[in-house]
């Protein structure tokens, strides 16, 4: 199974494994930024254009840190840690935001930086929501760029 996943990464423009996924793919525990960088380098060598090891959960520090490697340079995408249970969908939203920015002509790293900012804002806007039990959603609409929100029927 691991080989099948690595085969998918090999053809990816951008791969965004979280800590658990990256740990399984490289075959060892990832528990700090140095290990995140090492995993990003190892997974990028498989053939992906850019690998971003996402460190949002479990929390490593007072920041939400993602480590990106494109074969040339390591980038640390940092945002203040937001204490909230409303983080459901952050990984999918991050990947979708990267894809949207790539479609608009951004480089992979530019897209990742913009996506990190978007998801952080979406988490912040939903931080105090209380919807049901367990993990709640992030505020996708509120975090969207103003020009996109104006196109909504509500004009929000």
Task: Give the positions of each predicted feature.
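Short clusters of hydrophobic/aromatic residues that line enzyme substrate/ligand-binding pockets
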Residues: 30, 77, 138
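Glycine-rich beta-alpha junction loops
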Residues: 21, 56-59, 80-83, 116-119
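Charged C-terminal helix
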Residues: 109-156
């Amino acid at each position: 199974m691991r080989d099948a996943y690595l085969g998918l990464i090999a053809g990816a423009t951008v791969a965004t494994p979280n800590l658990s996924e990256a740990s399984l793919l490289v075959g060892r525990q990832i528990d700090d930024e140095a290990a995140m960088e090492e995993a990003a380098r190892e997974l990028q060598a498989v053939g992906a254009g850019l690998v971003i090891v996402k460190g949002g959960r479990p929390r490593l520090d007072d920041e939400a840190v993602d480590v990106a490697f494109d074969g040339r340079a390591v980038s640390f995408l940092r945002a203040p840690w937001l204490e909230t249970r409303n983080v459901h969908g952050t990984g999918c939203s991050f990947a979708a935001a990267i894809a949207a920015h790539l479609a608009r002509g951004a480089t992979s790293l530019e897209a990742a930086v913009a996506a990190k900012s978007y998801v952080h804002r979406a988490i912040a806007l939903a931080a105090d929501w209380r919807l049901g039990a367990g993990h709640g959603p992030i505020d996708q609409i509120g975090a969207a760029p103003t020009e996109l929100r104006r196109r909504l029927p509500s004009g929000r």
